[in-house]
Amino acid sequence: MSTSAAPPIDRQRIRELIKREERVLNERTGRSAEMFKRANRSLSGGVASSYQLRDPWPIYLERGDGPVVWDVDGNQMWDFHNGFGSMVQGHAHPVIGKAIQERYAKGTHFAAPTEDAIAVGEELARRWGLPQWRYTNSGSESTMDAIRIARAFTGRDTVMKIFGSYHGHHDTVMVSIGVEYDKIGEPDDLASLPYGAGIPQATVDMTVAVPFNDVGAMERRLEKLIAQDRKPACVIMEAAMMNLGVVLPEDGYLQAVRDLTAKHGIVLIFDEVKTGLCIAAGGATEKWGVTPDMVTLAKALGAGLPMGAIGGTEEVMSVVKNGSVYQVGTYNGNPLGVAATRASLIEVLTPDAYAHLDALNDRIVGACDMVIQKYGLPGYAVGVGSKGCVTFSPTKITDYASFKANQDAELSDLAWLFNMNRGIFMTPGREEEWTLSVTHSEEAVDAYVEVFDELASDLMS
């Protein structure tokens, strides 16, 4: 990764290209427009989740196979979206399909434990080095339950998180996510602000945010909270921020956080909903060699089925084992979900698969950096495992404040449109990253780079 000292870009040129590409995309997605009208009659906003929205209409998909998806207009695209990072196995993987079919014939739901659930727990314990596990059905459920367990274990209420990080849609963590730059606050006293309506102020006040990559600011905020008799129950964080593109931890940062939380008896939770099974076999915990007290998983865990998990130490998870905390859910450990997960862990996400993902990501990141240098674009490419992005910023992004101060939102919008119009399906947000799957090839990543080169050439001509 290298940042580029680039000349200013013609802003008018960016806006002209955005308008051109918007017209092209609208012309290519007429059936999506029609489907949006129909969907609005029964689905609020025309979609199943607010994160599926885009203006003037969402792109409705019809099917996927391996690294490729087709929308309802028949447009074929390389899938770099991969279900917000859930499909690192690729679409319709035959191993996963076989496991689901075999399980379906034996029954799909009992609300009772199965042998597959045990096997998955054993494999997760091996990969993460955390002995005790429970299941959920989503990332939001995983982080919600993990925080409840941490509160029960410590007897404390306050939660500390990283400013700008997303940890699901439950009230405790819907705080200090998308905030305008002038409302962020100072590093040692960042604001606690609700992410949307309907979140009680009392809940907001119990969640305290600190900047990423700044253990000094975290320590100073902790000292203030302790002086106020508000020592946190937990620190919940992504080891690498995955909703500002990709922001990697600085050397020594994660270990310093581990040491600080251990010193104060605060439960450290790594939210690996996005990184888990995507950047290494044991996620960020393996990648950077720092073991937290708890880990939360979802997304790629279920290989396309709704599946989440919480892992923890014997000590922390004892409050679940002894019945102090009711960690429950009718569909927790659903037979279809654990069957798909078991097949994925044992037969698909193998050491060879991770070597393949690492090689592909090195290829795409290196090639994108070459394009940036060739055309003098303001930005850099960064990636880890199956995850990566081009960050349009004249300086390196290290936290939310530097992201809001420097990210070129218009250029990010233009890049998304360019990709969509040239067969690259990407996530619909300025803050998202690509996710490769084990079925992606050099042809797929080279196609991404080719489109990026065309964008740079068109922009700088």
Q: Model-derived features: where do they sit?
A:
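Conserved N-terminal phosphate-binding loop of PLP-dependent enzymes in the Aspartate aminotransferase
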Residues: 2-461
